[in-house]
Amino acid sequence: MTGPATVEPELPELHFASGLPGFPDARRFVLVRLGDEASPFSVLRSLDDGTDLEFVVTHPALFFPDYEPEIDDDVAGRLELESADDALLLVIVTVADPVAASTANLLGPIVVNRHTRAAAQAVLGNSGYATREALVPT
């Protein structure tokens, strides 16, 4: 489904204290690069028993250089973010065929504290961002 992925995780284990929306029991994940080092995509893979979850993700700045979501104080507090530099942002990608038709969920970015590896999926209300933004403009 997602293709071959390297075995070495990019980051140590990530912890989602509340799971992901729709998947409350999926709390432990690793981020694994999809393809070679030049690939802009990774797989967010669940480590929890009974959850066979994988999401293709990417760094939004690679495709959306002007993307600057405002993470609300609740999410920032739960993740103990002291500054914007503490946060790693990822967006979930829906891979299409052809790949040029793939989309990214800019409305629900994954926010990771770079220091503690605490993570959450933020939901950006009234932001103007969409759940299916084209990766490649048409």
What residue spans do the PLM features occupy?
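Long, compositionally biased stretches
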Residues: 1-66, 84-138
